[in-house]
Amino acid sequence: MACNSPALAAALLCGAFLALPLHSQPLHAQTRPDPAADRLAFQAYFKSRFPKLPLAEFANGPYAVNAEMRKQWESINEFPPYDFALEEGKLAFETPFANGKTYGDCFPDQGIGIRQNYPAFDQATGEVVTLDLAINRCRERNGEKPLPYQTGPMASIAAYMAETSRGKPFAIEIPDDARALEAYEDGKRFFYSRRGQLNFSCASCHVEAAGQRMRGDILAPALGILASFPLYRSDWGGMGTIDRRLTACSAQVRSVPFAPQDRAYRNLEYFLSYMSNGVPIAGPGTRP
C-alpha cells in the first residue's frame, strides 16, 4: 500500500502497519504485537475518512458510503434474494445427522446467535477456526462428509447461523497466547502485502481506495467488510462464502489463490474480524 495519502499518514496507518517484516519472525524477535492498539488506529482512520458514518453502518459495505447504491440495495432487500438460502440453511441445520445429533450439538448455545464470536482461536490446536471450518469439523465428528467451502449447503448453513446473530457486534478475542498473536500478525501482514501481477494488496482497495469506484463497483471499507457474509452477489447469481470472495479477489489481482480455509485465509479473516469488533453482524447480505 502506498503511503502518499495524507489521510492515511494522519491516521498513522502506514507507519504503524507497514513496519512489518516481509517474512514471519518469532514474536520474541519483534516488538510485541498490540492488537488492541491496532484496532483503535484502524477504526479511527475510517471514522476520520467517513466522519458522518456511525460504526454500525460499516456493516453495510459499499451501501454505507454511496447514496445511489444504497437506494438500489434497499429496493432489492424488499424481497431479499438470499431468502432461499436461509430456508435451506435452517432445514439443514435442524436436520439430524445419521447418528441423531445436529449441528447445534457442536456449538455453544446450540449454534444460535454465535456468529459474532468467529473466527476463534483454538488453544488446543493452536490455530484459528472460522465458522465454516467449525461447521465441517462438526460434520466430520458426527460421521458426515465435509461440505465444499465456497457455495451450496455451506453458504446456506452459514447464512442461517449469521441471521440468528444479526445485530450482535463482532466480539473476536485474541488470547494472550504467542500462537494467537502470530496468527493475528500473519493475517495483518497478508492484508497489507502486495501480490499478483497487478501488485495490489487488500489495503490498496479497501483502505486507500475505500468508497471509490473501480470497474463500476464501489470499493467497500475494510472496517466491517466481513459482517454481511455469506453474500448473494449478482455477478455470482447465487450465494457465496468468505472463501469464495477471497478466491475471486485473488483472481482480480492476478494472483494464485490459496485453497479454501487455508491457514493464510483463516488468519486474514481473524485479523479483519478483530479489526471490526463492535460492528454488528448483518449477514446474510447482498452485493452487486
Question: How should these model regions be labeled?
Answer:
Residues A9-P21:
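Bacterial N-terminal signal peptides
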Residues E185-F190:
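Long, positively charged binding patches that form subdomain-scale interaction surfaces
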Residues L8-A9, H28:
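Low-complexity, intrinsically disordered segments with a bias for serine/threonine
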Residues L22-A29:
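Sec/Tat signal peptide C-region and signal peptidase I cleavage site
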Residues Q30-F84, T95-S156, E163-G167, E173, ...:
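Electron-transfer interface patches adjacent to heme c in soluble/periplasmic c-type cytochromes
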Residues M1-P6:
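N-terminal secretory signal peptides that target proteins for export/translocation
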